[in-house]
């Protein structure tokens, strides 16, 4: 099988490439160039797309004796990921750019190009598995499971993917990399937003969106202070509110709602963050069971709590509603709601699909 391995320059994709070679596949490594800024480095950040990362990926491919290429997806990334990130915050949402990158670039765009060039599959270093029926499962390594950030791809895309390291504990991956003599064996994991290398999201959004003054109010509508832009805030935020007027009982305040149209940011108690009803659109399907009415579990952030719920999915309307069996806090518009079926066997939970949260109660 002709396999294209997406090489981030980290230890996970390094070992994924090695395992693909060991399995006897015809393998090439590809690093995705997502930025035009050639000066962006990893020196002060833990992103995944720097010049240093590209050089690390090349060294691994050289050691494995496989071809290495850099494919430029910077224009697609700018529009589909960075543009979406800015637009979502401007709408008062809380997007996850890594999910959008997986959805639009690392799978959709990469697969299109790979298939056009005659490749049979794309392999990545993600922690998830695909069962014998072709459905995605959680990794059994719960601490590293990445099925949530993969829940936004389609079944058609999944059919051309595989995850060589999906169920292997991370310490074992690092040991395997050491045995291969890979320079990435001890390389730290990436977690920063790659297009905000200094980690200052508010400054980035301020430059991108500009000042849009509005008011912070309490749940009774009382005005507490003016702000420079609703994009400064996310649902569940407690730090950085800088509200001088204390609550009657001295309890902390949290952001409970953002109305981007009026610029109004509402703050309330921790109890005000609890939701038991979620609505989502922009649905993605990974399993035929994601249709009609059914019981399942939902996760709304990477490594977040998993809550049982009853789902109603209307494929024709591209809409789903979730009635939660127990409250979830800090659920924001723009986040992904990924649905799971509890595992019926020794493998991880089954990933049904996902939707983008557009409303809560």
Swiss-Prot record:
GO terms for cellular component: cytoplasm. GO terms for biological process: tRNA wobble position uridine thiolation. Its main location: cytoplasm. The record marks 126, 335 as: Interaction with tRNA. ATP binds at residues 6-13, 32, 125. It holds the Pfam family tRNA_Me_trans. Disulfide bonds join 101-194. One of its GO terms (molecular function) is tRNA binding. SUPFAM superfamilies: Adenine nucleotide alpha hydrolases-like. The keyword ATP-binding applies. The active site is at 101 (nucleophile), 194 (cysteine persulfide intermediate). Residues 144-146 are annotated as: Interaction with tRNA. Its EC number is 2.8.1.13. It is found in: Cytoplasm. CDD domains: MnmA_TRMU-like. PANTHER family: MITOCHONDRIAL TRNA-SPECIFIC 2-THIOURIDYLASE 1, TRNA 5-METHYLAMINOMETHYL-2-THIOURIDYLATE -METHYLTRANSFERASE. Catalyzes the 2-thiolation of uridine at the wobble position (U34) of tRNA, leading to the formation of s(2)U34. This is tRNA-specific 2-thiouridylase MnmA. It comes from Corynebacterium aurimucosum (strain ATCC 700975 / DSM 44827 / CIP 107346 / CN-1) (Corynebacterium nigricans). The lineage of its organism: Bacteria, Bacillati, Actinomycetota, Actinomycetes, Mycobacteriales.
């Amino acid at each position: 099988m002709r396999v294209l391995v997406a090489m981030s320059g980290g230890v996970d994709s390094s070992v994924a490439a090695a395992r693909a070679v060991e399995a006897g596949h015809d393998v090439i490594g590809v690093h995705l160039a997502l930025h035009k800024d050639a000066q962006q480095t990893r020196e002060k950040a833990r992103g995944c797309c720097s010049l240093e990362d590209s050089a690390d990926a090349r060294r691994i491919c050289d050691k494995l004796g496989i071809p290495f290429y850099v494919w430029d997806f910077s224009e697609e990334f700018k529009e589909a990921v960075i543009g979406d990130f800015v637009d979502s915050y401007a709408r008062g949402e809380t997007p996850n750019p890594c999910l959008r990158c997986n959805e639009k670039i690392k799978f959709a765009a990469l697969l299109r190009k790979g298939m056009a060039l005659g490749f049979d599959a794309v392999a990545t270093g993600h922690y998830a598995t695909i069962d014998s029926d072709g459905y995605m499962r959680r990794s059994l390594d719960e601490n590293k499971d990445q099925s949530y950030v993969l829940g936004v791809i389609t079944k058609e895309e999944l059919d051309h993917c595989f995850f060589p390291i999906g169920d292997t504990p991370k310490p074992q991956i690092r040991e395997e990399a050491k045995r291969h003599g890979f320079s990435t064996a001890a390389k730290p994991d990436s977690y920063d937003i790659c297009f905000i290398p200094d980690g200052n999201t508010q400054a980035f959004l301020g430059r991108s969106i500009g000042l849009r003054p509005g008011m912070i109010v309490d749940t009774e509508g009382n005005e507490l202070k003016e702000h420079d832009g609703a994009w400064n805030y996310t649902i569940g935020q407690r730090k950085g509110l800088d509200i001088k007027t204390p609550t009657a009982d001295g309890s902390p305040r949290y952001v409970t709602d953002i109305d981007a149209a009026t610029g109004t940011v509402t703050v309330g108690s921790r109890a005000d963050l609890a939701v038991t009803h979620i609505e989502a659109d922009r649905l993605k399907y990974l399993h035929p069971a994601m249709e009609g009415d059914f019981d399942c579990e939902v996760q709304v952030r990477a490594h977040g709590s998993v809550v049982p719920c009853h789902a109603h999915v209307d494929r024709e309307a591209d809409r789903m509603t979730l009635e939660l069996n127990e409250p979830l806090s800090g659920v924001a518009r723009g986040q992904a709601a990924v649905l799971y079926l509890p595992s019926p066997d020794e493998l991880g939970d089954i990933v049904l699909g996902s939707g983008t949260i557009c409303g809560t109660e």
